[in-house]
Amino acid sequence: DGFHLGTITRETDVYFNSKTRDFRETDEALRLRRTENLGSGYLIADNELSDGEVEVLSEITYKGRKLDDISMSRLELSSRIVDYDDMKAILEALGYYPVTPVVKRRKYYHGEEMVACIDDVEGLGNYMELEIIVDDESKREKALGLIEKQLERLGLSMEDTTTISYLSMLERKE
């Protein structure tokens, strides 16, 4: 419904926790993500760009507490990092330790105001995320309304969605 296929990636997320600040208790997250760009559209093989090169990007993200009970809306602060291994070593030197990794193959579909991601999460299966980035809290209600309308077009409702993160789902399986 107005969406076009963008990039296809493999994302490896390593979340961190701390003995002095348990992010499970505070409903926050600290994550390092390594993203392999597998290509775009239908011009890709299973895991390679057409010339065999795989572009890899890394970023660190802090996620604040969820802002409501019906969505995954929260403050997210992200920054690209040059050296993934050095950043991981810095976090560990500061007392953070890695927890269960989340690995997924993600297809990005872009709409006018919304991005839909189809995720194949290792150990969990397939999920869809609908996301609208807002730069002002006053726009959040409108964004949730647009997501609800898109779900209805797909024969779904907000009741069919989950606010449980992939990390939490994987940890519950252990």
Name every feature range the model reports, one short phrase each.
Residues 34, 119-123:
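Short beta-strand elements
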Residues 70-74, 129, 140-141:
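A short, polar/proline- and glycine-enriched secondary-structure boundary/capping micro-motif
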Residues 63, 123-129:
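Residues forming anionic-ligand binding surfaces in small-molecule and nucleic-acid pockets
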